[in-house]
């Protein structure tokens, strides 16, 4: 992540915006959502949106192969991660992707491991399917409790919802620890769902490792 300073709009401008972030709270509250940081859109995105609106190009969205092409290059450049574009599926947001994956795998009314402290949305997403959250908290140094996770896998819980980099503590789990997680998941025929949406925010002196870039066990789980 660059150390360059990027100015945000003035507060009076922000309070005039229409997003939930700026309408939900009174004016004496300064919301600081990581996922909505109020910086100006990149010039290329602004130009494309303006072009689409001016041409009324607003119909239903079908397959968008350009997204796969863009992500393939991005993942290779950032993390040396070679992806299979045929496996990419577009969803409206991370929560929808997680919920529908679990629904498709028959997890309604089942159990899923999470690692607190973690993004509050995890409880909301799993609640949509009446899924029981099995909390295996992070260790005091914010590392994953691999032994605790394996104990739950051995007890019959077959899904883990991972947050990496971890929200809210900002921990980017090491390749060694993710590889060990993949090993125990493979051993117990479990599945890891990795929410990696904040990966591009990793500081330059830290390394983000995609779960699927951690060897055959990760690819199998």
Where are these regions (language model features)?
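Walker B catalytic acidic pair
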Residues: 196
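Residue-level marker for buried hydrophobic side chains located in beta-strands
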Residues: 192-193
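Conserved core of the PLP fold type I
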Residues: 58-183, 200-219
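N-terminal small-domain helix-loop-helix segment of the aminotransferase-like
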Residues: 2-94, 100
